Regions:
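Short aromatic-rich membrane-water interface segments that cap or initiate transmembrane helices
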Residues: 61-65, 149-160, 266-273
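Hydrophobic alpha-helical hairpins/lids featuring a short glycine-rich hinge
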Residues: 97-129, 134
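Function-critical hydrophobic alpha-helical transmembrane segments in multi-pass membrane proteins
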Residues: 158-174, 183-184
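Alpha-helical transmembrane segments
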Residues: 2-49, 73-88, 92-104, 108, ...
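Transmembrane alpha-helix boundary signature
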Residues: 78-93, 112-118, 135-149, 254-256
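Juxtamembrane helix-capping/reentrant segments at transmembrane boundaries
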Residues: 53-67
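Membrane interface segments of multi-pass transport proteins and intramembrane proteases
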Residues: 145-154, 315, 341
Length: 378
């Protein structure tokens, strides 16, 4: 009983000392807040007819609201700022204020797109502008490759431009994998969950709480995403916001790791980060290359994604999503297990593992209910 705090000062000391307990509270807070908000968004969206339209690429039936991202955003922002009151220092609070404003702007871009179909070019310009403001406003950027490909420190201007490019790339890559039930949500949970662990182990507790806030919000979203009666999609609203938050975590982690590498458990920080986001990056680059080879716009939507291939092989949405989630978990564990290797050797190993695993669905054919491997002829 003596351990229990009796006043505000003791409460703060208690929360700071028992960090696992505090982290669990933040995770639960985010989950509950989002759970409360999400059904209201479903009801309002149906009343206002803010729902997904079926087309040749969609596989859902019936009326499904597309503003799940509003619920995820609300749960995330309320939780992150609650955590900031308890644990953030002045610099973290200033950077969080910038993060809040820019995430809200990105949410508005997503809502506009979900309701009125913004052109890809306009979305790209908004994303680029928001990313540049974030990088220059917070001074959080990737300023080293840690020796990957022989590159170490990067000049400030180039580092800022490259970091903005990474953020825009990850926003769009995450947006493109949001094609079947559960996929974007599960990938987001795994990426943000590992980032929470990485921040915690490196002594950046507040940043781990940001990651856990997203985990809790996405778990709540997944419950409704898999529901039949109260089903909801992330929409561009959610995929852009979540993609931005995931990109923020990756850029922040690499920025911190370069400044204090001895405190970071994962010596090969870029390999760890690349493994986490390898699925959306690989899928996006593959699809873009195919479109360009076929002389089509790289922004033209189609059914050439890996998750579409898994569906064509007979997997239900949830099993296809679980397969990708398992892949993400597996390659991240591989990245951690080869952490002690020289970074370029680790990169080659990861490149081979990722390429083989993600091209495997295209080497499998299904005939008369049976699966078999097929290989290109010489």
């Amino acid at each position: 009983m003596d351990l229990m705090p009796t006043n505000h000062a003791e409460l703060m000391a208690f929360l700071s000392e028992y960090k696992i307990f505090s982290a669990a509270i933040i995770l639960l807070y985010s989950l509950v807040v989002t759970m409360i908000i999400m059904p209201r968004i479903v009801i309002i969206s149906k009343k206002k007819n803010l729902t997904a339209q079926t087309n040749s690429r969609t596989s859902h039936k019936g009326v499904v609201p597309t503003l799940g991202g509003v619920g995820v955003f609300t749960g995330l922002i309320l939780t992150v700022n609650f955590a900031a009151i308890l644990f953030a220092d002045y610099e973290q609070y200033v950077n969080l204020s910038i993060f809040n404003i820019l995430t809200l702007l990105l949410l508005l871009v997503g809502i506009t797109d979900d309701l009125m179909n913004t052109s890809p070019r306009k979305k790209f310009l908004y994303q680029l502008l928001i990313s540049l403001v974030f990088i220059f406003g917070t001074n959080i950027h990737i300023d080293s490759f840690f020796g990957l490909l022989g590159i170490h420190d990067i000049p400030n201007v180039l580092a800022s431009v490259f970091s903005a490019f990474v953020i825009v790339l990850l926003i769009n890559a995450y947006n493109l994998i949001d094609g079947i039930d559960g996929l974007a949500g599960l990938v987001g949970v795994i990426v943000s969950g590992f980032m929470a662990l990485a921040f915690y182990l490196s002594g950046n507790f507040f940043y781990s709480l940001i990651s856990l806030s997203l985990v809790g919000a996405l778990i709540s979203f997944l419950i409704y995403n898999f529901s039949r009666r109260m089903k909801i999609f992330l929409g561009d609203t959610g995929s852009m916001v979540v993609g931005f938050v995931l990109a923020y975590q990756v850029v922040l982690y690499l920025s911190l790791a370069n400044g204090n590498s001895e405190a970071f458990v994962f010596k090969n920080a870029p390999i760890f980060a690349l493994a986490l986001v390898s699925y959306p990056l690989f899928d996006t680059l593959r699809v873009m290359c195919l479109r360009l080879l076929n002389k089509k716009s790289p922004f033209l939507a189609d059914r050439n994604h890996i998750h579409h291939r898994l569906i064509d092989l007979g997997l239900a949405h949830k099993y296809a999503s679980l397969a990708v989630a398992f892949y993400t978990l597996l390659v991240t564990i591989v990245a951690v297990s080869i952490n002690s290797l020289p970074i370029n050797i680790a990169f080659i190993i990861m490149l081979v593992v990722v390429t083989c695993l993600l091209l495997l669905p295209f080497a499998i054919c299904k005939k008369e209910g049976a699966w078999s491997l097929r290989f290109p002829k010489a």
